[in-house]
């Protein structure tokens, strides 16, 4: 019989979240008109005071609500579109001390793989006095107009989500990051080993402790 134990860790505190840059571009087809939105975030964080290292992961959930009118039937309706995605490519903690730059053309030795942080995990190693300001990028494509529906209004919100995770889950997700970039045909690459904390089984049992903040995004009237 498989069994496992997990510790629930204290959540991180979001002190402040701001958008420092937001860019929009239009994309038009014969059937529809889309807006592509890219946003850069600065998020000030504070960890609880403890005598051990702390581990987290982050994501951004963006939701847009459409108020629509069918051009043929004139019937009104509501549609909701949601996307979970963000990038920490330019952040020190999420890139483990090696953030990217807009023109990152440094030579990289081919047989040393560059690990991407697909699961957006990090620890408190880069925090000072329990505080840190994180840089995140998010993007979203949403429909502005099409032939079938007249879009009367679009409202959006972003929910920035942080999860306090266990050391075991942190190591597991780091291994998953490495595995996603692993080239099994390259004999010079070390095989990825996944940690396990389930007695009599395989995998990771973990309980995450979430905290989040919601920020309204621009509505269609603002464009």
Predicted region positions:
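A sequence/structural signal for flexible, mid-protein segments enriched
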Residues: 2-223
